[in-house]
């Protein structure tokens, strides 16, 4: 699972494009009156890369109603497929002009991979004494890792639903 996107890039299946690098919910500017996303902020991580990392991270962040800091409630974490549909509809409605067939092919993988990868990063940091991610208490990064692993489990549980959402949106060009 860990190499799926990099392998696709190496095989020439996914092109490099400009990516944000940290498109979590906190980095999306929301218009106060409409509640609509109007801009992405915090541009210090912009670079050439695979847009799948951005899409996966955005969905990881935006489809976990309990958030990254669910802490001891980590067992209640789930992937919200309704949020997934809404986010992907909005994204694809704007990005359809440059998305290629393989972009859609690897969307599910990107969603699952980013949650799993972040879980590994939090867990590794916990084992190393919380030296990378700031921790409010000794088990903070352990709980953060459990949140991401539970989210990964939920993403895998909803695999068929997520793939159907992607297929529906692609067929309707983001207009579902």
Show the residue positions of the predicted features.
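Secondary-structure capping and boundary motifs in well-ordered enzyme cores
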Residues: 15, 20, 47, 79, ...
């Amino acid at each position: 699972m860990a190499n799926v996107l990099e392998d696709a890039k190496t095989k020439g299946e996914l092109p490099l494009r400009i990516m944000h690098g940290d498109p979590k919910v906190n980095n999306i500017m929301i218009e106060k009156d409409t509640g609509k996303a109007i801009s992405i902020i915090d541009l210090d991580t912009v670079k050439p890369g695979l847009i799948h990392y951005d899409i996966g991270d955005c969905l990881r962040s935006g489809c976990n109603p309990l958030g990254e800091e669910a802490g001891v409630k980590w067992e209640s974490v789930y992937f919200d497929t309704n949020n997934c549909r809404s986010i992907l509809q909005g994204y694809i409605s704007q990005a359809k002009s440059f998305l290629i067939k393989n972009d859609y092919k690897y969307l599910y993988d990107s969603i699952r991979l980013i949650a799993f990868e972040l879980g590994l990063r939090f867990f590794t940091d916990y084992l190393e004494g919380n030296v990378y991610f700031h921790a409010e208490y000794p088990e903070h990064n352990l709980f953060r890792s459990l949140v991401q692993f539970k989210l990964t489990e939920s993403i895998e549980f909803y695999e068929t639903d997520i793939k159907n959402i992607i297929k529906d949106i692609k067929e309707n060009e983001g207009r579902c």
